[in-house]
């Protein structure tokens, strides 16, 4: 629905949705400093399908540990991950593009398995 509305209003089939609630995003997503209920993250929708998710990551050790604790996680279980925060990392972000999802939408396929080289389902778990 949102993609259709943006296509009609702005002539684009791509829509960025930003500032997802913190409780709905992973432990490494940076909270918005102006309103920590939300994150500095986004989804890119294309024709109604999420084709990428991304955002700014937490880069401060104390902030990361506090968020893990808030989400009920044990920071000791993530000692290797936390090492980069403890000994220094710079502000950074990331995203993951779903190429098969994007290809499915571009080709008008109803199922992403039609655009995967080795699709998986309940009967096929190996190539």
PLM features: residue spans?
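A translation/RNA-centric and nucleic-acid-associated enzymatic feature enriched
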Residues: 1-127
């Amino acid at each position: 629905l949102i993609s259709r509305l943006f296509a009609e209003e702005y002539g684009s089939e791509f829509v960025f949705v930003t500032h997802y609630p913190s409780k709905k995003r992973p432990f490494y997503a940076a909270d918005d400093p102006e309103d920590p209920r939300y994150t500095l993250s986004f989804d890119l929708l294309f024709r109604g399908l999420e084709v990428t998710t991304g955002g700014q990551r937490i880069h401060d050790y104390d902030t990361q540990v506090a968020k893990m604790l808030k989400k009920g996680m044990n920071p000791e279980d993530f000692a290797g991950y936390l090492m980069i925060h403890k000994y220094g990392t710079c502000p950074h972000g990331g995203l993951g593009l779903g190429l098969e999802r994007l290809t499915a939408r571009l080709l008008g396929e109803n199922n992403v398995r039609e655009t995967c080289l080795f699709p998986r389902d309940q009967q096929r778990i190996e190539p």
